């Protein structure tokens, strides 16, 4: 998103950048603690930090039809889902799941790339997938799950 700035492709004068790469939960944590000047965050965190940060006009990743998916192992009865792996407690994915399924309270933050394999191994009843996890879950024997409320 900021390739030209951080890789010296444009003249920034005296301005320099220290670039660090973290998963979204760690980025959210650092922004919440005020540890960064510029950071990618989850939209769900914005209300908590907007007094200290300004939302930029570019670099956003919000779209229609490509949001998180809720998956479980094939054949898992929806009413048996209790333990759910989420990509972070302050993520938009967790906020959406919490709003749709308020009865699920046993949520555990897991690195987004490890959620689908952990659900496939039976470590969690279900998981909320973002990024590439949304496209590979079927290969791991997982399926979309809807919980009856």
Task: Kindly give the residue locations of the regions a language model identified.
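A structural signal for short loop-to-beta-strand junctions that line the ligand-binding cleft
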Residues: 52-60, 83
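Small-molecule pocket liners
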Residues: 61-70, 142-143
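Bilobed "Venus flytrap"/periplasmic-binding protein-like clamshell domains
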Residues: 1-8, 22, 66-125, 130-135
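Extracytoplasmic small-molecule ligand-binding "clamshell" domains
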Residues: 1, 7-47
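A ligand-binding cleft/hinge motif common to bilobed small-molecule-binding domains
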Residues: 28, 32, 40-51, 116-145
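Conserved beta-strand segments of alpha/beta enzyme cores
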Residues: 16-18, 54, 105-108, 143
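Conserved small/polar residues in nucleotide/adenosyl-binding loops
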Residues: 147-149
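Short active-site-adjacent helix-start/loop capping segments
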Residues: 27-30, 39, 47-50, 63-65, ...
């Amino acid at each position: 998103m900021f390739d030209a700035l951080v890789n010296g492709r444009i003249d920034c004068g005296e301005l320099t950048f220290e670039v660090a790469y973290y998963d979204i939960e760690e980025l959210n944590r650092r922004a919440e603690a005020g540890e960064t000047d510029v950071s990618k965050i989850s939209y769900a965190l914005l209300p908590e930090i907007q007094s200290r940060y300004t939302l930029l006009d570019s670099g956003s990743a919000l779209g229609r039809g490509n949001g998180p998916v809720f998956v479980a192992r094939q054949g898992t009865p929806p009413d048996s889902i209790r333990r759910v792996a989420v990509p972070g407690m302050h993520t938009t994915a967790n906020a959406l799941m919490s709003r749709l399924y308020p009865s699920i309270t046993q949520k555990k933050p897991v690195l987004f790339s490890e959620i689908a394999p952990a659900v496939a191994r039976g470590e969690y009843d279900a998981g909320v997938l973002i990024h590439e996890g949304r496209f590979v879950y079927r290969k791991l024997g997982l399926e979309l799950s809807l919980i009856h409320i």
